[in-house]
Amino acid sequence: GFADLMGYIPLVGAPLGGAARALAHGVRVLEDGVNYATGNLPGCSFSIFLLALLSCLTVPASAYQVRNSSGIYHVTNDCPNSSIVYETADTILHSPGCVPCVREGNASKCWVPVAPTVATRDGNLPATQLRRHIDLLVGSATLCSALYVGDLCGSVFLVGQLFTFSPRRHWTTQDCNCSIYPGHITGHRMAWDMMMNWSPTAALVMAQLLRIPQAILDMIAGAHWGVLAGIAYFSMVGNWAKVLVVLLLFAGVDATTYTTGGNAARTTQALTSFFSPGAKQDIQLINTNGSWHINRTALNCNASLDTGW
């Protein structure tokens, strides 16, 4: 309709109408492509896809955390209470850009971040609780698909992200000054993190595919009825893409959760470490009263990281 209206503009109607019709066809092709891609997922359509993209716009704003100390605001990495989304006995789900600081007794301790939005007490991610959540998620998605209300369920899920109904289990404070980048900062560590951005994709997919047989046994032994019902329903209706998504989702939460790409990156780092130049120190020649001598103490902050101290 908009393209037809553009065509009635005097003098420039013909070229504008053609351009508007071409643009409308491009938008329709893009919409059909997104509908085809998201149609294999439960409760997804183009409108839900756009709402999900719009909901991601609030993430950068939540990545700045401040601490009020005697009326003075300090930028900190410690999560405030408003950033805590969900808590279990050993896991805290929080907004990105911070690390939970939990007070236990008379001492505060930084929890170990295992993901940008997940922190655990000791760095180990318990799989039992996460698999129960996946069981509930898959069961709800199966029910929505069976009742043909997938768009409604997706809308309710997006709106539900604005509200949190979870009792507090831990006392979170902002007096730890936690580090988002835990551990000793080295060149190999930074190289490992950079490799994590591109290397683990194929390894992660292959690892999840290889864990599917064990995941099927865990579904039956652990009585995960929501996942079993989802696999059975999607298999009966012939939607094998959803069956594969459910299997990969359940297999991704292994009993001993670890970063598969991290292991591959560590192996690569072990091989490349043989070619490491090791510690070094820049030597500078200083001219004092016409005589040259070596100044071995002329180090800046960046050079001191390479001396091995």
Curated annotation (Swiss-Prot):
Residue intervals on the Lumenal side: 62-230, 252-309
Keywords carried by this UniProt record: Apoptosis, Capsid protein, Clathrin-mediated endocytosis of virus by host, Fusion of virus membrane with host endosomal membrane, Fusion of virus membrane with host membrane, Glycoprotein, Host cytoplasm, Host endoplasmic reticulum, Host lipid droplet, Host membrane, Host mitochondrion, Host nucleus, Host-virus interaction, Inhibition of host innate immune response by virus, Interferon antiviral system evasion, Membrane, Oncogene, Ribonucleoprotein, RNA-binding, Transmembrane, Transmembrane helix, Ubl conjugation, Viral attachment to host cell, Viral envelope protein, Viral immunoevasion, Viral nucleoprotein, Viral penetration into host cytoplasm, Virion, Virus endocytosis by host, Virus entry into host cell
Lineage: Viruses, Riboviria, Orthornavirae, Kitrinoviricota, Flasuviricetes
Propeptide: 50-63
Protein's recorded name: Genome polyprotein
Organism domain of life: Viruses
Glycosylation site positions: 68, 81, 106, 177, 289, 295, 302
All ranges on the Cytoplasmic side of the membrane: 1-40
Any one cellular-component term (Gene Ontology): viral envelope
Family the entry assigns: Belongs to the hepacivirus polyprotein family.
Region spans: Important for fusion: 137-168
GO molecular function: RNA binding; structural molecule activity
Residue(s) at site: Cleavage: 49-50, 63-64, 255-256
InterPro entries: HCV_Core_C, HCV_Env, HCV_NS1
